[in-house]
Swiss-Prot record:
EC numbers: 6.1.1.20
Quaternary structure and interacting proteins, as annotated: Tetramer of two alpha and two beta subunits.
Superkingdom to which the source organism belongs: Bacteria
Name of one Pfam family that matches: tRNA-synt_2d
Protein name: Phenylalanine--tRNA ligase alpha subunit
Species classification: Bacteria, Pseudomonadati, Pseudomonadota, Gammaproteobacteria, Enterobacterales
């Protein structure tokens, strides 16, 4: 205890003489380490009378705190000096060009959706959306596809239980819209749909867009004119287009639309038809007063045709070498 002040003075001198952080840490160990000079002073307390030990211990702790503060201050000085030296040694060539920030790009399917929404937006269509987890009423029953209908088997549906499913088409959005508002109705419904299928031209999840018009005096001629204009605008060519009879439970008459490819072969691009009277009745619209047409198309398929992509799965593999081609 008698030479405590001397130990503090010696520690202060050693701290001031430390030229780097490593040397400073050696001083810390020498005085405050497990076997350091000041730490060992605590062992002398056992030689003192019990009533003197608290005061003596406080003096030793104050000395240790004084040394610790000196260590902290010196460490801050050394670190600041080291930083100044490093900055002084470094040179920055301000004439060098900055690092280029690479801009991202839209996914090709997103480009297709935006392009189609823009076209139909100019015709007065609004975008409508709905849930991807659907019930069988909106996905099937209301669309004139009752439980016993063979068309249900064509959809390869992902079922959660007896009534809940991942929607196989965005047609449920049409049902919800017609239930929520009276004609005139003019909507497009883009979104993800799900079917249990996977190969070069099918994936379990894909994007679909459906369109719907319900009003008075809507005819198949209106449908043909609208889709003619759309396809020629989308592909930016004066395409040869044909409508061939088909069958969909929710439209009557129904048709599939083909375009002539560059190889001289017909390519199917979408399905369409006049809204079936049963569908209108299911949503409370009088088919004696109103009529309408609907169409549906796969976004990936149109994107493949527009950009010449041969494998549908390329859109979902997140390969930047592929995606950067569409920037």
């Amino acid at each position: 205890m008698s030479h405590l002040a001397e130990l503090v003075a010696n520690a202060a001198a050693a701290i001031n003489q430390a030229s780097d952080v490593a040397a400073l840490d050696n001083v810390r160990v020498e005085y405050l380490g497990k076997k350091g000079h000041l730490t060992l002073q605590m062992t002398t307390l056992r030689d003192l009378p019990p009533e003197e030990r608290p005061a003596a211990g406080a003096v030793i702790n104050a000395a240790k705190e004084q040394v610790q503060q000196a260590l902290n201050a010196r460490k801050a000085e050394l670190e600041s000096a080291a930083l100044d030296a490093r900055l002084a040694a470094e040179t920055i060539d301000i004439s060098l060009p900055g690092r280029r920030i690479e801009n991202g790009g839209l996914h090709p399917v997103t480009r297709t959706i935006d392009r189609i929404e823009s076209f139909f937006g100019e015709l007065g269509f609004t975008v409508a959306t709905g849930p991807e987890i659907e019930d069988d009423y909106h996905n099937f029953d209301a669309l004139n596809i009752p439980g016993h209908h063979p068309a249900r088997a064509d959809h390869d549906t992902f079922w959660f239980d007896a009534t809940r499913l991942l929607r196989t088409q965005t047609s449920g959005v049409q049902i919800r819209t017609m239930k929520a508002q009276q004609p005139p109705i003019r909507i497009i419904a883009p979104g993800r749909v799900y079917r249990n299928d996977y190969d070069q031209t099918h994936t379990p999840m894909f994007h679909q867009m459906e369109g719907l018009i319900v009003d008075t005096n809507i005819s198949f001629t209106n449908l043909k004119g609208t889709l003619h204009d759309f396809l020629r605008n989308f592909f930016e060519e004066d395409l040869q287009i044909r409508f061939r009879p088909s069958y969909f439970p929710f439209t009557e008459p129904s048709a599939e639309v083909d375009v002539m490819g560059k190889n001289g072969k017909w390519l199917e691009v979408l399905g369409c038809g006049m809204v079936h009277p049963n569908v209108l009745r299911n949503v409370g619209i009088d088919p004696e007063i109103y009529s309408g047409f609907a169409f549906g198309m796969g976004m990936e398929r149109l994107t493949m045709l527009r950009y010449g992509v041969t494998d549908l799965r390329s859109f979902f593999e997140n390969d930047l070498r592929f995606l950067k081609q569409f920037k």
